[in-house]
Amino acid sequence: MTSEFNIRWDMPPAAIEAESFAAIEREFYGWEELPPAEWKVMRRLIHTTADLSIGEGLAFRHDPIPSALEALRRHCPIFCDSNMIRAGLSVERLRRAHPGYAREDIHCHISDADIAEQAKSTGRTRAICAAEKARPILDGAIVLIGNAPLSLARIARYALEEGIRPSLIVGMPVGFVNVVESKLLTGTCPVPQIVLDGRRGGSALAVTTLHAILENLPAS
């Protein structure tokens, strides 16, 4: 019975990926005209979601990929808004940019006890409080936002009002409230950024974006 569905059980992982990428390149019109480094990121995100329209919604502003790679080579800190991002990032891949990377270089304060208490006492979201706690490390850092739009908006305000300059902002919060607005605000910042417009996003996409950027490093 299962043979009717033409499932190819014996395909190795590399062949599956290659065939998937070939399908994306057949179906995504005009990819050849994109900068190769940006296409690597876009293709990975399309591959992660099986959604070709993801590519049409991505904005690359202020040379984000060279800026991110330079920052990673100097062992910059990484701030993220969810524990899923912190757990999903590959330290092994980060060490391709700098051998000193460890899990402790990936900062996420969303579950910190002091953040929970501060949010409760002030009536604000934990996401805002966590972004404020990370304020001392944001200048020159890589920022990955895949969940909380208010975290993205707070960091955008730091950039606009205080001159804080992350080396990269990945702006991919997801949802229905404050999401579009936070992305539009980020777009006004003179900061290297990769932003997915609209309501779509997610922690998995933020992780995929940084991993895809690392693919632009020379093979070791």
Model-derived regions, located:
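Short, ordered loop/turn segments at secondary-structure junctions
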Residues: N83-M84, S111-A113, A148, M172-G175, ...
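Long, charge-patterned amphipathic alpha-helical coiled-coil/hairpin "stalk" segments used as oligomerization
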Residues: Q118, R124-S182
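General beta-strand structural signal in soluble alpha/beta enzymes
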Residues: I78-C80, C108, L144-I145, I194-L196
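Electropositive, gly/pro-rich neighborhoods at or near active sites that engage anionic ligands
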Residues: M1-F79, A87
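Long, charge-dense
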Residues: L94-L138
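C-terminal functional extensions of proteins
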Residues: S167, V177-S220
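Buried hydrophobic positions in well-ordered alpha/beta secondary-structure cores of metabolic enzymes
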Residues: D81, V170-G171, T209
